[in-house]
């Protein structure tokens, strides 16, 4: 519903729409193949890091990037490594200004994550390893951690 001047009404419901999602950057490395494909003598060490960035694009649109870096190694020897930047363009409307950042950095990556997880699982499987199923991520906790780090940086 709109007012007579064409603007949204005060009671318009908040909305979050996915306009596009895409692989922005992706790499998978299997540097020690075919030796790395043999049954490992022990459980590999798996390391995964997740970062989220959001940039406003105007008209309520935001580009949100979910960056997942990781890999597996045994005794310091790399089995595989990957880097994925999976992004989406979202339209966020009728959300209070103070809530835009949490929506962009919590809810948007939550929608992107299952697709990014599948891309990584498929790449690891296609690299000759069992699929890597990344555990669900608590994006609210990541956001809180980020806010604490930024607060500490400002105080320093």
Curated annotation (Swiss-Prot):
It comes from the Bacteria. It is found in: Cytoplasm. The keyword Zinc does not apply. GO terms for molecular function: unfolded protein binding. Its main location: cytoplasm. GO terms for biological process: protein folding; protein tetramerization; protein transport. Keywords: Chaperone, Cytoplasm, Protein transport, Translocation, Transport. GO terms for cellular component: cytoplasm. Pfam families: SecB (PF02556). Disulfide bonds: none annotated. Belongs to the SecB family. Homotetramer, a dimer of dimers. One homotetramer interacts with 1 SecA dimer. HAMAP family: SecB. One of the proteins required for the normal export of preproteins out of the cell cytoplasm. It is a molecular chaperone that binds to a subset of precursor proteins, maintaining them in a translocation-competent state. It also specifically binds to its receptor SecA. This is Protein-export protein SecB. It comes from Xanthobacter autotrophicus (strain ATCC BAA-1158 / Py2). The gene is secB.
């Amino acid at each position: 519903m709109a007012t007579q001047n064409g603007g949204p009404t005060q009671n318009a419901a908040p909305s979050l729409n996915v306009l596009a999602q895409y692989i922005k950057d992706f790499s998978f490395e299997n540097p020690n193949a075919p030796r790395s494909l043999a049954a490992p003598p022990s459980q590999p060490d798996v390391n995964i890091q997740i970062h989220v960035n959001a940039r406003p694009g105007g008209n309520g649109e935001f580009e949100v990037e979910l960056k997942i870096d990781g890999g597996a190694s045994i005794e310091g020897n790399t089995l595989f490594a990957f880097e994925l930047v999976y992004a989406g363009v979202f339209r966020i409307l009728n959300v209070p200004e103070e809530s835009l950042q949490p929506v962009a950095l919590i809810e948007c990556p939550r929608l992107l994550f299952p697709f990014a997880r599948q891309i990584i699982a498929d790449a690891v499987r296609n690299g000759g390893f069992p699929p890597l199923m990344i555990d669900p991520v608590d994006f609210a906790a990541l956001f809180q951690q980020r806010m604490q780090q930024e607060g500490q940086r400002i105080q320093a």
